[in-house]
Amino acid sequence: MYGFRPNRGCHDAIKELYKRLNNTKICYIVDADIKGFFDHMKHEWIIRFLKLYIKDPNIIGLVKKYLKVGVMEGEELKVNEEGLAQGNIISPVLANIYMHNVLTLWYKFIITKECKGDNFLIVYADDFVAGFQYKWEAENYYKLLKERMEKFGLQLEESKSRLLQSGAYIA
C-alpha cells in the first residue's frame, strides 16, 4: 500500500508497477479510482476497522469526536455525517486503514485464492491497479470490486476506472 507513508510515495508505486508488468505474465489491468473517496468513507466502518488495531477506548473516543467535527462553509458550520476532512494529519492514516480493510485484505484473502495465474494489487491512496494473467480473472475482479465498494459506501469513478489489455503475453 502506497501513499502518505515514508518511502511509499507515488514514484515508489510506479516503480513497483513497472517491475510487476515486466516480471510477470500479466495481460489484463484493472485501473480504478474511487469516486469522492474522502467524502464517502462511512464513520461506522472507520471505527470498526480502528477497533481491530486499537484496544484503548480513549483513543477510539478521540477519533469519534474528530469524525464529528464540522467544517465552516462561509458562516455556516457543516457537521460531517460521513467522510473525512482532507488536509489534516489524521485523515491520510484513517484513509489507509479504510483501504487496507476494504480492498487490500479482501484482495489478499479472497481474490488471489480464485486466481490461477499471476496477479498483483498496487494501492496508492484511493487509486489502485490490479493485474491479472487471464481475462476472466480481471473481468470477475472488476465485477466483484463494484459490489465490494458498495458494501462500504463507496463507488468507482467510472470515467477513471477501466479494464485494459497490457503486456507481452497477450495472445
Regions found by a protein language model. Give the residues of each.
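Conserved polymerase palm-domain catalytic core
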Residues: 1-167, 171
